[in-house]
Amino acid sequence: MRRRSPGKTHLPRKILLAATVLIWLGAFQRVSGQSFFTLVPCRLEVICLLPPEFDTSNDLEHEFCDQLAERLASEQGPAWRVSVAPPSLEDRAILRAALRRDLNFDPPTSWRKLALRDKVAVVAVRRSGLGWHILARDWDVRVERLGPLVEKTVPTWSDVPEAAAESVRQALVPVARIRLVEQQAVRLDLQGSLLMAERPTLPGRLFLTLARYEDRDGNARAVVPLPWTILQSPEGPPAEDGSVSCQVISGLKNPLSARRRGRVQLLAWAVTPQVRPVTISLKNRQAPQNPLVGYEVLAQPGGEGSPQFLGRTDFAGQVEVPAEDPPGWKLLWVRHGRRVLAKVPLVDGSNEFTELALPDDDPRLLAEGYLMSVQDQLVDLVTLRSVLIARLRARIANGDWDQAIRLRDQLLQLKSREIFSSELTQQQQRLLCPDPVGQKQIDKMFEETRRLVNLYLNPREVEELVKEIAMKAPRRSDTP
């Protein structure tokens, strides 16, 4: 009986193993460009708060929950893992608080455990005069935020399950992980996007940016929104890897690429603009952080076109920013004198960021006003000086020495370059700005004014005319 060589026996296995590794690496390379987040289904826990008459009938309550779960599961398939259940007795007060408007919601500790769920959707069904009123709201465990409240009214009970499912779908706020691509461009990896039957399209959608700081167990130590930074997705379909490209719009320099210690996730939370005004407050960056009064606020809708003047801050440092119709986002300009202090994005109707800390620009504005008056004086002086020099040359050419001497004396009595420079130096020493950028601009404005003074008040031309008169004019006799 012939025996095979051990090397030949294991050779096909090695080839098969190598091929398997190559295939796995190829698949890993395709996925590693994005995040595995796109392959992870969203664990959605729906809690139904039904009318009191359902408390006496567990069958009706469970039947409604089963119908709702079936409708939600059929919508996204493997992208969602849905569980629907009625609340416990102790959870009812918490659920009612989650459905109130404009309330600081303090969720139970279990709602902050990312190991248990990704989202909690609260649904309440109530009787109304027109039939049945449905409310739904999303609590996202990853960003620890409540979404907007969704409300619907249907006439009959048979319409409630479908309306409740639609309310939940509308209430769920998209959350994504941010993947840095370029300094002003990122990609968003939406949870479970590669598991969806249809890739999500988010044309022109706006996102707030947040940093989630985690402990060793994956629980959030803090979820901090990045101030004055939004993301905007372009028109068009998503990429093949399920990600969505976005433009970074921020009033900060490199807001996403800053170094952060520990386990940190950069997340995007979709926000919907609203048609309602927002009041912006400006305050001094340095203690005691007094309000900044009289600062101009301008707006560029969509960041395009010429800035439109909105108003000046009042005694409290506040100004109201109206919303556009249809609502979107705008780029706010804060200007003081001729200096633009900030350009920050604002989503219409969003009260996420309403306070902007800026350097006190009053010393720089005082310097600007003073130097503008100095330049006005300089223009008047140069004009008068030029007229006197022209007349003096004409009198010298005609030999009218009496008039020439009178014009010479008028020229010598004008403010000289040295006096201008001395006044500028004294005033510059008095104007000190606590803001380094503002102080740098003050110094630059003074240097520019000195350059103009030295350029247009050159004494050489006047000195030459004085010498010419001294040489050519007849000397007056001291005796009659």
Residue locations for each model-derived region?
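Bacterial N-terminal signal peptides that target proteins for export
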Residues: R2-L17
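N-terminal segment of the mature soluble domain
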Residues: T56-P108, L388, L407-L411, S421-Q426
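Beta-strand/loop-dominated core regions that host nucleotide or nucleotide-derived cofactor-binding catalytic loops
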Residues: L149-T153, W157, P161-L195, T201, ...
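Short beta-strand elements
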Residues: K343-A367
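Amphipathic beta-strand/beta-sheet edge segments enriched in Tyr/Trp
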Residues: A115-S158, S243, L331
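Conserved, compact domain cores that house catalytic/ligand-binding motifs in diverse enzymes
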Residues: K283-A316, E320-W329, L371-V466
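Bacterial N-terminal signal peptides
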Residues: L17-A27
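A structural "domain/chain start" motif
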Residues: G33-E75, N284-P288, D360, R364-V382, ...
